[in-house]
Amino acid sequence: MTNILDRIKAYKLEEVAAAKARVSFADLEAQARAQAPCRGFAEALRKKSAQGYGLIAEIKKASPSKGLIRPDFDPPALARAYEDGGAACLSVLTDTPSFQGAPDYLIAARNACALPALRKDFLYDPYQVAEARAWGADCILIIMASVEDALAVELEAAATGWGMDVLIEVHDGAELDRALKWLKSPLLGVNNRNLKTFEVTLDVTRQLAPVILAEGRELVCESGIFTPADMAAMAAVGARRFLIGESLMRQADVAAATRALLAC
């Protein structure tokens, strides 16, 4: 049976082909070069995590596993709420078919605050990296479960060329080994959610954290964090940086919820 990553890859490749037909790579590069310099995603996380926790706060309307998460969806207001609550960075979904995201959400959210922003999407072509920069993104995501080694290297090089940071995402030891071997970016995210089954367990971070920290990389714990107790449990294994979306997106007062989560 086709898993979700296979389905997403199929429609993403179609999206990229259509985008290239609309906007040439040369025109897209011109748009990217016209953007203000990147805000420094990894550095913002470092500064916040040195004082407590570094939070990548996610702006996400829906997901394949949970459906609609936030009916009252206002990206600029959410970005300001996250900033007021003490987040270090934003993560904004730009995938439409599976997450009801959009490039306009990334643009609007980043313009509404001073935080660096990650384009949260499934990338398979350097064209998408240039898109991210043209939309103002300061960081991209490379999901090791969805790309081969050579493509991961190509995407990282493209991001570095634009002055962007890279968040590398892994879910198991094999993906981590590949990331450590082929990629140089310091931010290494552990997704506690299996993207093929959607099962979530914090044991994934517990298992991989020692290796990541021993290699001198900067651990980011992703998915499955809902309470201060969850954060404390992950901090006990060395996590000081977190990517959190759903639990905050479901709160009426996002700024207060963010503040409370970071106060633990």
From Swiss-Prot:
<dbReference type="InterPro" id="IPR001468">
    <property type="entry name" value="Indole-3-GlycerolPSynthase_CS"/>
</dbReference>
<dbReference type="InterPro" id="IPR045186">
    <property type="entry name" value="Indole-3-glycerol_P_synth"/>
</dbReference>
<comment type="pathway">
    <text>Amino-acid biosynthesis; L-tryptophan biosynthesis; L-tryptophan from chorismate: step 4/5.</text>
</comment>
<keyword id="KW-0210">Decarboxylase</keyword>
<keyword id="KW-0456">Lyase</keyword>
<dbReference type="GO" id="GO:0004640">
    <property type="term" value="F:phosphoribosylanthranilate isomerase activity"/>
</dbReference>
<dbReference type="InterPro" id="IPR013798">
    <property type="entry name" value="Indole-3-glycerol_P_synth_dom"/>
</dbReference>
<keyword id="KW-0057">Aromatic amino acid biosynthesis</keyword>
<comment type="similarity">
    <text>Belongs to the TrpC family.</text>
</comment>
<keyword id="KW-0028">Amino-acid biosynthesis</keyword>
<keyword id="KW-0822">Tryptophan biosynthesis</keyword>
<dbReference type="InterPro" id="IPR013785">
    <property type="entry name" value="Aldolase_TIM"/>
</dbReference>
<dbReference type="GO" id="GO:0000162">
    <property type="term" value="P:L-tryptophan biosynthetic process"/>
</dbReference>
<dbReference type="Pfam" id="PF00218">
    <property type="entry name" value="IGPS"/>
</dbReference>
<dbReference type="GO" id="GO:0004425">
    <property type="term" value="F:indole-3-glycerol-phosphate synthase activity"/>
</dbReference>
<protein>
    <recommendedName>
        <fullName>Indole-3-glycerol phosphate synthase</fullName>
        <ecNumber>4.1.1.48</ecNumber>
    </recommendedName>
</protein>
<dbReference type="InterPro" id="IPR011060">
    <property type="entry name" value="RibuloseP-bd_barrel"/>
</dbReference>
